[in-house]
Amino acid sequence: MAPNIRKHHPLLKMINNSLIDLPTPSNISAWWNFGSLLGICLMTQILTGLLLAAHYTPDTSLAFSSVAHTCRNVQYGWLIRNLHANGASFFFICIYLHIGRGFYYGSYLYKETWNTGVVLLLTLMATAFVGYVLPWGQMSFWGATVITNLFSAIPYIGQTLVEWAWGGFSVDNPTLTRFFTLHFLLPFMISGLTIIHLTFLHESGSNNPLGITSNSDKIPFHPYFSLKDILGFTIMLLLLTSIALFSPNLLGDPENFTPANPLVTPPHIKPEWYFLFAYAILRSIPNKLGGVLALAASVLILFLAPFLHKSKQRTMTFRPLSQLLFWLLVANLMILTWIGSQPVEHPFIIIGQLASITYFTIILILFPITSALENKMLKY
């Protein structure tokens, strides 16, 4: 019998082992769809971004006009821009749900996969930040100024570091040029990291909602999960196109319709919605260095997840106390997101400070204690 090209061709067999004949646990739920949805987000963003870059001019005097020109004069330029801007929001929705799934079901115990995932999140955040600066509107400019300025809190080398990053003494043309360069480069770095992420995942195989070994009950990825993924793609792309066509500026800041002006500061400087939780934590500490450290810790704390796992069970499926704590954490993150969008005044200051303390307390203290308590209750 002739050899099957899908299983023997050096390149095709890699694709086959990753997407077609991949042994997959039969009981993974829709929460396992977000990995592939992130892949679709990445491909959509690279495609729309490439088309936008073809019409963009990274120069302070032309950037704003070039984006306006793309929307007015390029065939479907408005649609490409709206898909790209809102695609970023969907990217973050998917990655937050993906991380939440990993946290709930104990997927972080695959340490290599989890750590590469956190690095992916950090790279995505960097990409989104530099991308937001490119239209060179008011919020682009002041957002870049405020966030890059945080590096000056680093003792001794801070100020030098900031001026080196800016390429001058303020956010100006060199800054915009290098941000465009980085925004073009980073998505390809994300693609490379994604391959590493998947390589580590396929070493161990997928986790499942029960958190027990599923070697005795595996089914091929195709057609079962390929079809399930396509359903996910359809729903997400339908939502993305709907928002891009019906309400493209829903998540944006009206301030960004005004060209950047270093002489006028917007009344409320705030990042896009997906960074608001971290921004609230940054603002809740009345000290610059302390705020920067808290901001970094709010995301880097994910690296500690494998070490904070004290339960004898992997997932939270059969751990009601940990479940309660998990949803408290989700609610807390939503409160932080809301606080990040509000002005710095009473009562928002104190709410933000309490929510920030709660965020770290739940993850660092309450989760391990609750896990130990649940172990005791089960008489382990």
Curated annotation (Swiss-Prot):
The keyword Transmembrane helix applies. A ubiquinone binds at H202. Coiled coil: none annotated. Its cofactor is heme b. SUPFAM superfamilies: a domain/subunit of cytochrome bc1 complex (Ubiquinol-cytochrome c reductase), Transmembrane di-heme cytochromes. It is a multi-pass membrane protein. GO terms for biological process: mitochondrial electron transport, ubiquinol to cytochrome c. The keyword rRNA processing does not apply. PROSITE patterns: CYTB_CTER (PS51003), CYTB_NTER (PS51002). The chain crosses the membrane at residues 34-54, 78-99, 114-134, 179-199, 227-247, 289-309, 321-341, 348-368. Belongs to the cytochrome b family. The cytochrome bc1 complex contains 11 subunits: 3 respiratory subunits (MT-CYB, CYC1 and UQCRFS1), 2 core proteins (UQCRC1 and UQCRC2) and 6 low-molecular weight proteins (UQCRH/QCR6, UQCRB/QCR7, UQCRQ/QCR8, UQCR10/QCR9, UQCR11/QCR10 and a cleavage product of UQCRFS1). This cytochrome bc1 complex then forms a dimer. Component of the ubiquinol-cytochrome c reductase complex (complex III or cytochrome b-c1 complex) that is part of the mitochondrial respiratory chain. The b-c1 complex mediates electron transfer from ubiquinol to cytochrome c. Contributes to the generation of a proton gradient across the mitochondrial membrane that is then used for ATP synthesis. This is Cytochrome b. It comes from Harpactes diardii (Diard's trogon). The lineage of its organism: Eukaryota, Metazoa, Chordata, Craniata, Vertebrata.
